[in-house]
Structures are given as C-alpha cells and as structure tokens.
Amino acid sequence: METLTAFILCGGKSSRMKSEKGLVLFQGKPFIEHIIQAVLPITGNIEFITNTKEYDYLPYQKRADIVKDKGPLGGIYTALTNSETEFNLILSCDIPLISSELLAELIAKHNQEAQITVFATESRIHPLIGIYSKKIVSLIREVIDNNELKMMDFLSKVPHQIIKIEESENFPLTNINSVDELNDLNINLS
C-alpha cells in the first residue's frame, strides 16, 4: 500500500473516564503516546482529530471537527476530508495495548477494493481500528447530515472487509472506556 496517513480520534472528555481519554495514564504514559509508539513503525504521517488544546505538547498536526458533536463518524469525516492519501489508518485514542504488529497485519491483509477494513472477533467488530478510503467522504457527509451516527450501520452501507482474529488475539484491541476498565487492565497485566 502506498503512503498512509494515521488519524487518531481524540474524542474529548469521556463521562465515564472523567477526563480526556487519550491523556489517561497507563504504565506511566498517556494512552495517546502508546498508540503513537505503535503507529510510528508504520508511518510518521500522524494527525490528531481533536477539539482541545490538551494535545498541543505533541508535535503532530491537530484538526478540529468540521461538523461538531457527531461522534466517531464526525472525526472520520474530518480526517478523510483533510487527508492527502487514499487510504488512512483510523484509530480511537483509547486503545493503549495496540501493537505495530497488529497494525501491520491490518495493512498487509487490506484488500484495495474494500473502502473500509477492520478487525473482528466472533463477538465484536472493531470499527475504530481500521483502514478507511478517502472515497467514502461524501457518503459519511450524507449520514452525518441525516444524523445516522451509528458506526455499525455505516459499515453495512460501505464495501468493507473484515479481518477475523481469534478471541485470544482480541486483548490488544481492547478499548478502555472507564476507570473500572483501566483498573481491570492494570490487574490483568500485573
């Protein structure tokens, strides 16, 4: 695959986390820095979709949502609208265990015909760890304008590819949404 841009969706204050999710500390550093570390071997072309200045300490391009308060689809719309590459790695900011190896697998298995490629286990699809084509910008705009913001509904409207992984491989894809989940993660890793 030609050059890729990685966009990390820094969605703002989480009601369950009580703070900016990407800046929550895990093993001594913010989630966002764990994600950057996983992305850098893949591409140095990293941008953040964020409406806050809290990420300004990191030397990457930041972009505010073009259409506010539209959840992950709004962030993906902003990313793809601003992207200069056809294919883009879209990641949420709450996946501190993501690895370069898994991202490389996603890219290696991506079929160029698919406009979205994501991982899935038997029990769960991971739409916010994926490769998204710039070609779907107008379709995203359409669903945003209609306030159809559910990621799974959107996925069903687009030619997409699911890369199956075993439940046992699911752990690095875990997204951390609450203090309890963070505590569980710390316990599981200790």
PLM feature spans:
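Nucleotide and nucleotide-moiety/phosphate-recognizing core
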Residues: 1-148, 156-172, 179-180, 184-189
